Amino acid sequence: MKKLGILNRDIARVLASLGHTDQIVIADCGLPIPSNVECIDLSIRLGVPNFVDVLTEVLADMEVELMMAATEVRTESPSIHQELENRQISIRYLPHDELKAETSKAKAIIRTGECAPYANVILRAGVIF
């Protein structure tokens, strides 16, 4: 049995398969999921698990060179915005509609139970060397 890191087998598999510049998404429970992208649905009920907890665990296991978030998160969900800013990773902000379009390029979308507005982030894989 695995002792450390992410126990969810689907998330662990996706993270292990990422190459440089591949993307995954951590999403709130309302983000539309493109039909061509794998959805790893963690949602149990509204708010569980929350966006920040999932983001924290994924970032502990993944080298990220860039995060992409909706411009609207700055004003509509300031606490989520602050959590993103606290990560010391470059962030590119784009309008929510553009962010949604960009999710079709992701290897997977991890759906949380988060219900804060615009609590979505695209993580672009970096390299560990």
Curated annotation (Swiss-Prot):
It is an enzyme of class 5 (isomerase). Its main location: cytoplasm. GO terms for biological process: D-ribose catabolic process. This is D-ribose pyranase. GO terms for cellular component: cytosol. It comes from Shouchella clausii (strain KSM-K16) (Alkalihalobacillus clausii). Belongs to the RbsD / FucU family. RbsD subfamily. The active site is at residue 20. Substrate binds at residues 28, 96, 118-120. Its EC number is 5.4.99.62. It catalyses: beta-D-ribopyranose = beta-D-ribofuranose.
